[in-house]
Amino acid sequence: FMSDQTGKNVKYIWDPNEYINVMMFNFKSPDDSSSELLGISNMPLTVKGDSSLSGLEEINISSIKKSQLQYAYCSSINSKYINSESTRYTNKGKSSYQYQSTDINVTLAHELGHYLGLHHVFAETKKQNGYDYAETCFDSDYCKDTPSYNRKEYNDYLYYYLSQHSTGSSIDINDLTKRTNCDGETFESANILDYAVGLGYKISADQKYRIRHVLYNSPLIPGPKVSQGTRSAS
C-alpha cells in the first residue's frame, strides 16, 4: 500500500497538509521472518537551507500539494493487533502489570514518532529502502540524550534469556528491558522509539526538539509553519 508509486493509493488519504493520516489494515505476514510487522510510517522531508534537519531527506521546495504525491503519505498500523494492550491502560495499577509486545498504544506512538522525524534509538545503518541493524554500537538517531545500543547483541541476549526461562513465572521484566549502551553502561528501555522488550512511554528533550522542528518547517505536515517564502512544487 505505502510502497506503491503509481499514485493510485493517494485517493485513500486526506490532505497531509491538514491531517496526519493513520491507516489501519491487516499486514501481509513476511515469508522470510519469524516476527510480524506492527506498523510502518513515512519519514518527513526537510527543506534545504537554514531549516534543514539532520537525518531527513532534503528537498528544495517548502510546499507540496496532495495532488502532486505519487504515494500514500501516512502511517500504517497492523489492524491484527488493534485490541492488544498492556494492562497498565486497563487495571490502573490495581493488579500486577502484564506486558504485551504488540501493545497498540506503543505501536501508534512509535510510528507517529517516525512520522514526525524520530529515528530508532538503537544503532542502525541506512540502506536503499530504509534502515538495518548496525553491526557495531554508535549514535544514529541524532539525539544525544537517548542512549544508543547494539540491537543485534540485545536480540541474541533476549533469545538466550527466554530459552533459559521456559516458564513465564520465572521471567523478570527488568531483565528484558535492560540494555547496554555504547560505553558498556546498563539502562532501562523506556523510549517510544525502541523495540520490544521495552516500557515505551518516554520522549526525550532532543526528540521533542526534532518533533517541533518538523511541525514548524516540514512540508506535508499539518499546522502553522515558520516563514520559508512562497516557493512550491509546480
Feature-to-residue mapping (PLM):
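Metzincin-family zinc-dependent endopeptidase catalytic domain
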Residues: 1-109, 115-135, 139-143, 147-148
